[in-house]
Amino acid sequence: MQAVPDIRIRRVNDQGIHRAGDFVVYWMTANRRLHFNFALDRALEHCRALQRPLLILEPLRCDYRWASRRLHAFVIQGMRDNAAEARRNGHAYAGWVERSPGGGSGLLQQIAARACTFVTDDYPCFFLPQMIRAVGRQLPVLLEAVDSNGLLPMRAADQIFPTAYAFRRFLQKQLTPHLTDCPTPQPLADPAVPRLSQLPDLFERWPGLCSDGELADPTGWLETIPIDQSVRETSYTGGTVAARQCLSLFLTRKLARYGEERNEPDADVASGLSPWLHFGHIS
């Protein structure tokens, strides 16, 4: 199994690994998928080295800018897919949706008290970098952020490019060595990773842990979340399953025409993957 390249791994704090901890935590924040994900691969590397099980934590805040029913529903549909994938492979998964602003305060520290180490996603946009830095200062164990944003690692570039043309020239020269570094297609299937038979008893003070039934049909309880309820769901379904269906449609019906018709809006030959790429449901 290929190791995660060092250039993709960033230490967020100066804490060490708590080798006597009960589990390794993958704190999912941007790459909300359990396939082809360097951050998940890194968490599993720690699991194998420490012989500790994995705890997958996928939280969703309610107080981020533009929080709406539409965005929440899309992310929660992805949680449903992730919960099913973790269950198929015998791993513990916690999909947690904040029910009131600040309702998750202290949760990560509580989990970290029993963890060996934390791994999260290294994503350069929105409120996530600031949040990761703040959490890193509060955790008593090592927090690593791992870049799984694209084929080229973010830290392979040592400058800000003034134009897309300048970046493309750099990319054409520098991308090739990184193309052989691939995340694992089915990382949770590894039999060498111990399994956590059930979720740790850590969530009583933080209501929001979602049952399979709540993830399957969030329609009713979403009404109780203090988000913009006027921005309703669309016909799009979130999650890896729907993302792969969209990708398959593009490859089988649109790709052959894309080269000549991509600039024709009425041709509808674009991939249509933007919503799923945005939330990391597919890479």
Feature map (PLM): residue ranges:
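Trp/Phe/Arg-rich N-terminal binding region typifying the photolyase-homology
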Residues: 1-187
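Glycine/tryptophan-enriched, flexible segments
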Residues: 19-20, 160-283
